[in-house]
From Swiss-Prot:
Gene3D superfamilies: Aldolase class I. This is 3-dehydroquinate dehydratase. GO terms for biological process: 3,4-dihydroxybenzoate biosynthetic process; amino acid biosynthetic process; aromatic amino acid family biosynthetic process; chorismate biosynthetic process. Its EC number is 4.2.1.10. Disulfide bonds: none annotated. InterPro entries: Aldolase_TIM, DHquinase_I, Type-I_3-dehydroquinase. The lineage of its organism: Bacteria, Bacillati, Bacillota, Bacilli, Lactobacillales. It comes from Streptococcus mutans serotype c (strain ATCC 700610 / UA159).
Amino acid sequence: MKIVVPVMPQNIEEANQLDLTRIDSTDIIEWRADYLVKDDILTVAPAIFEKFSGHEVIFTLRTEKEGGNISLSNEDYLAIIRDIAALYQPDYIDFEYFSYRDVLEEMYDFSNLILSYHNFEETPENLMEVFSELTALAPRVVKIAVMPKNEQDVLDLMNYTRGFKTLNPNQEYVTMSMSKLGRISRLAADLIGSSWTFASLEQESAPGQISLADMRKIKEVLDAN
């Protein structure tokens, strides 16, 4: 499994102060641009992409509807994504499928989409249908993050991931059950067929994230012969 570390600067000064030495061995950087006001995103972008030019980068606008910090119309959401893609060619672009499904057809020319679904309230009863709908679209990555209310919710997320990966071996999945209760799903990513796990530098970008330092240690143990 690859380790993804989110960075969440709230202004250009914080972007410039990001310490590369702390994340040098990280596989992928996720830029959570929703920590900025809309008009600052393109201003901060050059600092981010220059600083992380040696890493794979995910561009993410996590909206309030899915646990983030920004509210955007369909038009603004698409415009920002297209501007960033044209100027900086991020390796991956997160697209909130269920929040912006009506405009997905305008993204069909993007081959690097992460079609994502985030539910910070529950693990929905129709989780299998969520997996099916996203898988049928065959994006670069299917990402699903849900909140468990009990142990069975965690096991359901893990079992569905394993099952869909077995049936669709060429599709990349990134899944997690959030909070402390769901933390095992982050550690068992390889086992269940999830390609990435997310780790935090300091501030969590989602409940239950493990620190990068701890995740490196755990990964060493899991990868040891």
